C-alpha cells in the first residue's frame, strides 16, 4: 500500500471510515450513559411497604342475649387490612371483618366474617332457665358496599352460619359520613337484618323438652325480617395511626323473633348496644 506518493486511495478511504466510526462511538458513549442515568433518576423507587393493617378492641354494653331486657359488657376484636397508600376505609359498628378483593373509586366487594356470641343458661338463669346452651356461631360470606356520593355509603353483607346455626344472615346498612374536622368524623343511618329460619331456630324456637323445663310454650321461629333500627358513631384520630370511637345502635325485633315467648315473656323487642373502641394502624412489608 505504501509508495512514494504515500497512502493509496483505498487506504485513505479505509482510514477515513475508521476515524469516523471511532468518533461516532466516542460521541455516543456519554449520550447512552446520560440516558441510563436519566432513566434511573426518574424511575419510581419501590414502595417502602405493601400493606396497612389496623387492629383494635372495643368494649360493648349490650343485651345479655338477643331479645334480653338486661345488659352485660363484652369485648370485641377489630381488624382491617388494605393496600399501603390507600385511604382508610370507613367502618360502621355493624361491619364484619373483611377486606376488598375487587375495588373501584366508589365500591368494594370481598369476603367477610362475623362471630356471634353463644348463649348459656348461666348467663341469665331466670330468663334462660330450661332452654339449654347455644354455642357461638361463626358466619362467613361476602360483602358489597357502594358510595353514592362522598358522604353516603350503602353496604350489604350475606353470611352463612358454620357453627351455632346453619342459616343465612343478611345485614343491610346505610350511613351518612360527615367529616366535621380533619380528626373528627360523625356517621349514622338505618339498619335492617334478614335471616332464614335455620338462623333463628337455635335462639328463638322452643321445643317440647325446652317447654317442659322452662315453662314457656312450644314455639317454632321462622325466617324473614329479624330487626330494623338505626345507629350512630363518632370517631376521632389522635394521630394518623391511632383513633378512638364511640357508638350507639338500636334494633327493634320484628316478625317471628319478636313473637317468640322468650322475648314476649322474659325479654324485650327493644335492643340497645353502646360501645367504645380504640384502633392502631401498622404498615408492613410483604415477606415474600
What annotation goes with each model-predicted range?
Residues 1-48, 267, 283-288:
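Cleavable N-terminal export/targeting peptides
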Residues 34-87, 108, 119-121, 283:
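Short glycine/proline- and aromatic-enriched beta-strand/turn motifs that initiate or cap beta-hairpins
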Residues 36-37, 85, 98, 161-269, ...:
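Outer-membrane beta-barrel transmembrane domain signature
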Residues 51, 61, 71-77, 134-140, ...:
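Residues that define the transmembrane beta-barrel architecture of outer-membrane proteins
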Residues 51-57, 77, 107-111, 142, ...:
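Transmembrane beta-strands of outer-membrane beta-barrel proteins
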Residues 55-60, 120-124, 148-155, 206-216, ...:
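Flexible, solvent-exposed coil segments and beta strand-coil junctions
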Residues 55-63, 88-96, 125-129, 152-162, ...:
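Transmembrane beta-strand segments that form the barrel wall of outer-membrane beta-barrel proteins
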Residues 63-76, 121-136, 223, 256-262:
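Surface-exposed strand-loop-strand hairpins of Gram-negative outer-membrane beta-barrel proteins
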Amino acid at each position: 500500500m505504501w509508495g512514494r506518493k504515500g497512502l493509496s486511495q483505498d487506504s485513505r478511504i479505509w482510514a477515513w471510515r475508521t476515524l469516523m466510526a471511532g468518533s461516532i462511538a466516542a460521541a455516543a458513549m456519554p449520550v447512552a450513559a446520560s440516558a441510563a442515568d436519566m432513566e434511573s433518576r426518574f424511575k419510581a423507587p419501590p414502595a417502602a411497604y405493601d400493606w396497612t393493617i389496623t387492629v383494635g378492641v372495643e368494649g360493648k354494653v349490650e343485651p345479655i342475649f338477643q331479645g334480653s331486657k338486661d345488659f352485660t359488657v363484652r369485648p370485641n376484636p377489630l381488624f382491617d387490612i388494605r393496600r399501603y397508600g390507600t385511604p382508610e376505609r370507613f367502618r360502621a359498628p355493624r361491619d364484619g371483618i373483611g377486606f376488598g378483593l375487587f375495588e373501584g373509586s366508589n365500591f368494594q366487594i370481598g369476603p367477610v366474617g362475623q362471630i356471634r356470641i353463644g348463649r348459656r343458661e348461666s348467663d341469665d338463669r331466670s330468663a334462660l332457665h330450661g332452654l339449654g346452651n347455644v354455642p357461638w356461631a361463626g358466619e362467613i360470606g361476602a360483602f358489597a358496599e357502594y358510595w353514592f356520593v362522598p358522604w353516603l355509603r350503602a353496604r350489604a353483607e350475606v353470611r352463612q352460619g358454620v357453627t351455632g346455626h346453619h342459616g343465612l344472615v343478611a345485614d343491610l346498612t346505610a350511613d351518612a359520613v360527615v367529616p366535621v374536622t380533619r380528626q373528627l368524623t360523625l356517621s349514622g343511618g338505618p339498619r335492617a337484618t334478614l335471616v332464614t329460619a335455620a338462623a333463628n331456630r337455635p335462639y328463638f324456637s322452643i321445643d317440647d323438652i325446652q317447654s317442659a323445663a322452662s315453662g314457656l310454650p312450644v314455639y317454632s321461629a321462622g325466617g324473614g325480617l329479624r330487626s330494623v333500627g338505626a345507629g350512630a358513631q363518632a370517631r376521632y384520630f389522635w394521630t394518623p395511626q391511632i383513633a378512638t370511637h364511640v357508638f350507639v345502635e338500636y334494633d327493634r325485633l320484628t316478625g317471628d323473633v319478636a313473637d317468640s315467648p322468650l322475648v314476649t315473656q322474659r325479654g324485650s323487642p327493644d335492643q340497645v348496644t353502646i360501645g367504645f373502641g380504640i384502633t392502631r394502624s401498622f404498615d408492613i412489608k410483604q415477606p415474600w
